[in-house]
């Protein structure tokens, strides 16, 4: 089984890639970390989108895990247009593009699995992270729509919406926010960040 994972050089993506059986096709930005995989593509989503598309179509992908993500903590009246573009591109446009390139093969074999890593912020909204929340909410909506399109082809698509996760992205998000980690943990029913392996 050929499994494509974005954001595979760290955090949730790296943990998923290390724990799945199958042939992993790892996508990320850190070549040193990606070298642990037999098949990998160093990819900057701003510059390498055509290369990414060719990589997907040439490798007959059975399973897609859209995990790569960007986060910014800025109130709505302080965010710049380039910041908006970057988050929407990485968190919504690129997953849609990847799916569009993977679906023809999945449809041809009448089987496929797509998992998008969303966020609880896309479900509830997060003050101070409006564009992040919007991008993840869009990912959830896109997932629901595509699920209706591909159901008869025996292809499933779902979104996992974690809360705070003990990753570089999660911890950097705390540093950027106005809240301490302890204050955030007090709002989590488990009273802790989850580990990537729990996703």
Residue ranges and their predicted role:
Residues 75-76, 83-88, 184:
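Substrate-binding pocket helix/loop in short-chain dehydrogenase/reductase
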Residues 188-199:
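A conserved structural motif in NAD(P)-dependent oxidoreductases
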Residues 9, 17:
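N-terminal Rossmann NAD(P)H-binding glycine-rich loop of SDR-like oxidoreductase domains
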């Amino acid at each position: 089984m050929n499994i494509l994972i974005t954001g595979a050089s760290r955090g949730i993506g790296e943990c998923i890639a290390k724990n799945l059986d199958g042939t992993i096709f790892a996508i990320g930005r850190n070549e040193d970390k990606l070298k642990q995989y037999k098949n990998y593509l160093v990819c900057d989503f701003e510059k390498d989108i055509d290369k990414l598309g060719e990589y997907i179509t040439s490798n007959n992908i059975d399973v897609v895990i859209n995990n790569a993500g960007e986060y910014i903590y800025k109130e709505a009246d302080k965010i710049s247009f380039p910041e908006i573009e970057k988050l929407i591109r990485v968190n919504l446009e690129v997953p849609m593009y990847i799916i569009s390139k993977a679906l023809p093969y999945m449809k041809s074999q009448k089987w496929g699995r797509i998992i998008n890593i969303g966020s609880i912020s896309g479900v509830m909204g997060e003050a101070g992270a409006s564009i992040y929340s919007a991008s993840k909410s869009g990912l959830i909506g896109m997932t629901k729509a595509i699920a209706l399109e591909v159901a008869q082809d025996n292809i499933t698509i779902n979104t996992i919406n974690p809360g705070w996760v003990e990753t570089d992205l999660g911890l950097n998000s705390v540093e950027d926010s106005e809240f301490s980690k302890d204050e955030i943990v007090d709002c989590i029913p488990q009273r802790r960040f989850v580990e990537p392996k729990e996703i």
